[in-house]
């Protein structure tokens, strides 16, 4: 049963590998959007350089209703254990933690924050 459907424009490169995801909706001042997108790519590269199996992607909503003025940021890990370990490392001062702080500094407000376990569903239609 499909519980949610919508359209999104990918603003940063990523490979669709559903798994355990932190999903946030953020408001960014228009003049900071480019810097924010760049900062997400810097963070992802720093995490991968540190050996993390992680992806970070940013999407703009199409037909997003009341959340149409926000960006969706999805951080992808293979499972909950991996995601939890990354949070522990980040709070302990991992080499990439300053890149995370720099990215967060460009966020004006967090509109929504959740952890989701996602999968791709194929239909016969």
What are these regions (language model features)?
Residues 1-125:
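Short S/T/G/P-rich N-terminal loop/turn motif that feeds into the first structured element of a domain
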